[in-house]
Amino acid sequence: MIPNNYVEKIYAGYLGMNIGIRLGAPVEPTIWTYERIQNTYGEITGYVKDFKNFAADDDANGPYYFLRALYDDAVDRDITPNDVARAWLNYSREGIGMFWWGGYGVSTEHTAYINLKKGISAPQSGSIEQNGQIIAEQIGGQIFIDTWGLVNPCNPKKAADFGEAAARVSHDGEGVLGARFFCAAISKAFETANIEDIIEAGLAEIPSDSLYAQVARAVLAFHEQHPDDFRACRAMLERDWGYDKYTGVCHIIPNAGVCVLSMIYGQGDFNLTVEIATMCGWDTDCNAGNVGTVLGVACGLSGIGEHYRAPINDGIVMSGISGYLNILDIPTYAKELAILGYRLANVPCPPELLDNKENEIHFDFELPGSTHNIRVSDPFFCRVKHSTEQAYQGSGSLEVLFDRMTRGESSKVFYKSFYTRDDFNDERYSPTFSPKAYSGQTVSMKIYLDQWGGNAPMTIAPYVRLAKSKRDLVQGYRKLVNEQWIDVEFVIPDTEGELIDEVGIVLESDSTRKPKSLGRIFIDEFQIYGSAAYTIDFHKQAMSFGCVTPFAHNQGAWSLVDGSMYVMTAEPSESYAGNYFATDYSVEVTLNPQSGDSHLVAIRAQGAMRGYHAGLDGKDQVSLYANDFGYKKLASCTYPWKLNQEYDIKVTADGSTLTLSINGEQLLQHEDDAWSYGMYGVSTLGAARTNYRKLTITEL
């Protein structure tokens, strides 16, 4: 059964998860004991730390990336542990990002990943038999599974089964039971807000004699006797179920107790529940994130405090292998999850959901309170919020207040299309990014003026900002017309090798000092679409989170040297960038092979384990490979090439036709339809040193 408000409930649940993560993350390090949190912050009623932008977190990475097994492998059947294991290998960069790389035999996820790389398939990769009970029963079994509950609404058994399949990649025993419990609880929350019923639905999907069930029952029994004192219950957990009894870095059982504690003492209040989960210590971001998903779904958007929601502003970042996927718009993702939910339930999907195109940006502001991460450059003059007063289409739009502006005063209203290290306070989980907007694409939006004061109408000018130079490329100014919708559309100009990190409008007053401009504009149907055509000039790039912008590197040592990207590696390595969903395009790379036999260009790469690679391949040879969890040579021919000589290598994918040209000469053409979309990049199949001077990408 799919509830009528399914998309909105998913939206609330996913917001809730990320609110919990953001609230709990600052006090997650073990130095933050329960007592220290209480003595420092007392009763927590809001975020304890402000961020420019909240960096990536493993608790968000896993639910997002591992669910992609439903797109890649389990397209028309139920999920298996091996499907999810393939997502682990495909979307992770080894040793960085995604999850905690704490060492084999220390970090459960690191251990499972190495097992998978060594050919130990799931579920053996996460089993007690393989890794021992302590490693297998750490908390990760339940912290990467929220989305499996979100795509299986009102079906706790199926949600639990999917969650178990996903968790078995890395966990076993009680660790898997945590996945079953939370997926079932999330699923149940779609049909009831009664927290007791939700908890019981979770417990119904695990053995009653399990430790997980026992700690949950101990908390519920304590609550019956002491319903108003969560701190007394926390003391009971410390005494009877603490880390001294359940060892490892972060065992699931004590934290399961905190999760049930926060839900039962929170009594259906979203804010209070995530606050209690944070105040209780131990794995604060994991616990607050899990219960945040449950309570977000149960309470809906109206139950989430604006002081928690506003700083997120509908945007989060990830740290998988795709810099494009790492920039996530929550309302858009809620719709994507809903489409999966309808598919899994074998129920026809509402046509309006299917209108979304993965390779484009489309913000319709239809979900209540949605802002799609639109920002203003000057909050003194302008403020954004969701509105239902005006809408070009549907019922919602973005309202931008402009407050007493005079001639020459302005504020930018923009979508943040790309990030660098300077946009963050820290380097949590080392995210990397590829822009969401490129030269050649079209930007369009509808704008309505509701001006209350001033002696001249407001003016706007579309613009994009260049990420390295911070230079605005401003298009022509035009006057708005009061109480009318106007179309604003422009083609993003050639950025001459730079990346774009802002797309929007400059809102400027033309009023004299008295009376000042006061009023609102409404923005609706914000879109970025069409074929991109751009270059990457490495003179205009930077190192960000250890990567050359806009790439995500996997293995090898990468750097910027004299205006070029340079790799030195003793093993196979690759680097990816671009629109993850790009279909037909060419990528031309000017490279200089300096040592080694393999110097390739990637196209339609869907991760570390999927895609095409073509280029210089051994002495006097060029080849085309398909990577499908292992490289298979599709075609090759003789081509005399030399080290320390520059080559222009162009690879084109057009339908099923793949073409390799070097210095303008077509050398290979082959038909293959394994991969229809994906990123571009560069790679090597072995030890090599290569210098890359320029890339040109042209979508067909």
Predicted features by range, described:
Residues 467-501, 639-646:
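Extracellular carbohydrate recognition and processing domains
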Residues 392-396, 480-486, 583:
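Ser/Thr- and Asn-enriched, surface-exposed coil loops between beta-strands
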Residues 436-438, 446-454, 493-495, 590-596, ...:
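Solvent-exposed strand-to-loop "edge" motifs in beta-rich extracellular domains
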